[in-house]
């Protein structure tokens, strides 16, 4: 009897071993979710300068360098005029993630060089509202001049689904101190159309004793196909009123959405004051291309 049990046990072991070889079992290996490859985005724009020539700007930015938690920032840019003069060139590096961000920007031309530091925080207040705070400081060194201008800016904005409000302060050391308050609202929107309205007030105090206020409002319309119009009116206390209109249109967009060509135009006219009837116009083209890199 014992021999029979032993023989049966051996037979069972051999059978199980044969099954294991015939049907091997593998533990599932977790596959990480796909990540977007890095993108090199190229932006180019040309705009008419009322003083002559065309203002040309180019920018090359790298995105999707990090992961869903942390995103590095890297870009280089240059701006100049077709009639010559100084060419502004610079670079920005930084990092953002978890609603926080910080960056530094270095710019240089033939006259001065600037170094800008910026930090921001975005606090979500539910599904459709957020509180955004920003601070920045720009230090400028002008060749041949001991005076070093410094511009400090800070802002706090509450942005909701259809309403928003903000307050900001810009201090240009030795020149001016500006406090701006604004309110914005979405008047109408659907799948194709969007209309926003905003009003603002700025109190400008200059170190030379000339103080004034700017108050104004604007209507901004945009279409889902990439077209838009805006119109605004600004009152400068003690100076006069100025009207502004502008528009933009997407002239071309590639089938893959990586390349687009946009045109913009704008104009302003003083309605009263010492600059009454003075007009300024601007026209521009902007080319953007996102080149995917594996």
From Swiss-Prot:
It is found in: Secreted. Residues 23-24 form a propeptide. The modification Pyrrolidone carboxylic acid is found at residue 25. Keywords: Amidation, Antibiotic, Antimicrobial, Immunity, Innate immunity, Pyrrolidone carboxylic acid, Repeat, Secreted, Signal. Residues 1-22 form the signal peptide. Sarcotoxin II is an antibacterial protein which plays a role in the inflammatory response of this insect. The main effect of sarcotoxin II on E.coli may be the inhibition of cell wall synthesis, including septum formation. Sarcotoxin II consists of at least four structurally related proteins named sarcotoxin IIa, II-1, II-2, and II-3. This is Sarcotoxin II-2.
